[in-house]
């Protein structure tokens, strides 16, 4: 007798379906049970407003979480950068698989890199974080660009470049990789140029907190280094009281001595979207061995950033 299928709640977008499909295959291998994808439409998918206008935080996950709490699905897959930093009562992030490339990338006309864009180039992005850092980079390198707010899926965003409406768009490398379009990238942006969003490139697999057997099975997919890194990044975001649409970038990476991981470096940035002012700091310490240690690393760096005026650069802080 075939075991009952596990139901995986996912957004309907091509990217969400691709990443949910990868997780479904992994869960099926671990549990020996089939996994059925259950498509759910979220408010963030149907609204055409910019993320900053609709509140940003949680707009892509609320419907998935409601389905989990109602028992309509057994687990859900989120892009971690879309997940609110506060723990949701009754739910648990049972797995954070190994992270994909966290960098941002450029898809530009005529195969141009960021530094090769024509004077006055129109560069599309949906993220105030990217706008702040791209405009700051342009200011310090004698470039003239116009950052243009855009929404839409990968096809829509790249379509603006193909149609000539924009000279370039900036997207997450991980998303393009998951939908098989990484070969369209014309420039991989160094994290020294643009720090990614907290949790960018990582997935969160969430289920009911009282489903002990499923939590144990999903834990097989968890990558402890990725979890420590994104916990520190998201702790910084939470301590800044910033939502996922705020102009905040963060990246924790591991510093190795040969084959041995020695330390974790956490970098954070917050800035005005016109790029006129950035607060960018970093800290390095032992690799956090507990959830609390990772939280502390992010909180400490956030406190330093706030002491240097970060709060005044974010506009409206998350409520």
Curated annotation (Swiss-Prot):
Gene3D superfamilies: Periplasmic binding protein-like II, Porphobilinogen deaminase, C-terminal domain
Pfam family, one: Porphobil_deam
Principal EC category: transferase
Residue positions, PTM S-(dipyrrolylmethanemethyl)cysteine: 244
GO CC entries: cytoplasm
Pathway field: Porphyrin-containing compound metabolism; protoporphyrin-IX biosynthesis; coproporphyrinogen-III from 5-aminolevulinate: step 2/4
Enzyme Commission identifier(s): 2.5.1.61
Note: The porphobilinogen subunits are added to the dipyrromethane group.
Oligomer status and interactors: Monomer.
Cross-referenced PANTHER family: PORPHOBILINOGEN DEAMINASE (PTHR11557:SF0)
Name by which UniProt lists this protein: Porphobilinogen deaminase 1
